[in-house]
Structures are given as C-alpha cells and as structure tokens.
C-alpha cells in the first residue's frame, strides 16, 4: 500500500499474513466496537465472517496435523459455520491448493488479536492516540507484529531475542509458569 511503499519499501520482503490479513480483521473488530453494524442483519453478517475466520484456524490446523481430511473440513464448515456446501468446498480447496502456507488461514484471527492487544496496551491506556497508533503501524510496514511492538517500545533487541505472541491478557505469565 501507499504507506509501506512510501516509508519502508524494503520491508515488503518480510511481508507476513499475520500483519496483512490481521490488519483487515482488526479493522472489522474495531468497526464492531465503534458500533458500525447498526442493523441486526449487519451484526449477523459481521459475526458470521468472524466465525468463518475462527473456523479457518480449526480446519486448517486440523488438516495439517492430520486429524481432518479435506472432506471433514468441508463438513465442519457446513455444520458449524453454516456455509453452503459449494462455498465450503471452494474454501477448503483454496486453503489447501498449495498457494498458501499452512498457517495462512490462522493468520487472520491471530494477527488481528495481536494488533488488538497492542492497541489495548498503547491506546486504551492513553499512552498513544488512536490515529498515531494506526499511522505508526502503517509506517512500520508489514513485518511481524511483535517486531512492531518492540519498535514502539524502543526496545533494543539482542541477537537471541525471542518474540512473544501477546494476544490474550495474561498468556505470557501462564506460559512462563509451565516452563
């Protein structure tokens, strides 16, 4: 897009669906929070597509872990999400035709949740204005979201730095306890 071409064009090499697809779903979530869907039909439509993206995580990971066949993935979309069979079949074929890496379908929701969590940490606490947050995110470009968080925090990264996926409050503490 315009911002990444203007500010950090070299970062296109590090493009990640967690940023690109996550950014799109993040906006859907923000529009929901701002009351954009006014009618019951609008609300149902937005919830349907959010459920669809959650289902992508389940069927994609299940398929790649060998616990679901493509046919079971189609059945899952028909029975749980209420897709028409032809639409579910096309979605599964599109997901597994070799054009997308295994975690691509999970990137929509997981990327959105990462951006949402970063927004909670920076905007909801008053540390950053919402417009500044969005502008800064776009200026940094499509790099891993945890890298953007470290840039915003002006954190110096060591050569052995490990990212932390912060998309659920308290997850870092519960993961640390298990180690």
What is the predicted function of each stretch?
Residues 1-179:
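N-terminal maturation segment of proteins
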């Amino acid at each position: 897009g315009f911002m990444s071409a203007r500010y950090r064009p070299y970062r296109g090499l590090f493009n990640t669906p967690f940023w690109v697809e996550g950014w799109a779903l993040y906006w859907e979530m923000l529009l929901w929070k701002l009351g954009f869907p006014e009618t019951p039909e609008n609300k149902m439509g937005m919830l349907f597509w959010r459920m669809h993206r959650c289902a992508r995580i389940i069927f994609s990971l299940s398929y790649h872990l060998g616990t679901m066949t493509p046919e079971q993935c189609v059945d899952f979309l028909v029975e749980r999400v209420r897709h028409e069979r032809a639409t579910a079949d096309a979605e599964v074929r599109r997901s597994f035709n070799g054009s997308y890496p295994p975690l691509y379908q999970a990137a929509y929701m997981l990327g959105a949740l990462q951006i949402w969590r970063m927004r909670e940490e920076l905007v909801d606490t008053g540390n950053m204005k919402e417009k500044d947050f969005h502008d800064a995110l776009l200026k940094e470009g499509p790099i891993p979201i945890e890298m953007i968080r470290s840039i915003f925090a002006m954190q110096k990264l060591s050569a052995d730095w490990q990212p932390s996926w912060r998309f659920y409050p308290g997850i870092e503490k519960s993961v640390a306890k298990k180690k």
